[in-house]
């Protein structure tokens, strides 16, 4: 029986709401810092819109992975991937594990299973989620003003996520197009000097 008592639901939603105020490293096309919630929202849209490329995918599971993947950052904030250490990952996992353990059944077990599957990255859904997570960040960087990029991002836009898309021709093609957009953006910046 899937039921969450209303007070617990409001408590969970209040914690999740913090992601609206947790800034990510990247900027939006409008010039403000993107929030973790916005990243998760668009990642989920991406998963929905590419799902027809994967007829055997469990779409509900994939969408859930995308929705919950950064909930731990409600406790720790966002640490950019190029700065995140094992200690940062352990801290986020600790807070998330403690929080999820307080969920009522069956939500607790389902979320624990989803996080485990995402971490192990052995299923199609976990592979798609992780590839899209990387791609969404790259797309957002392309949509931001290049003046917000830090020097290392010029290289990251060429390489980040390459190791996550190889299982899919479609996602490889998407990664290639995102890289081409990055190259055009960099070339345009160079021609404006």
Predicted regions and their residues:
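Alpha-helical, largely C-terminal catalytic domains
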Residues: 1-193
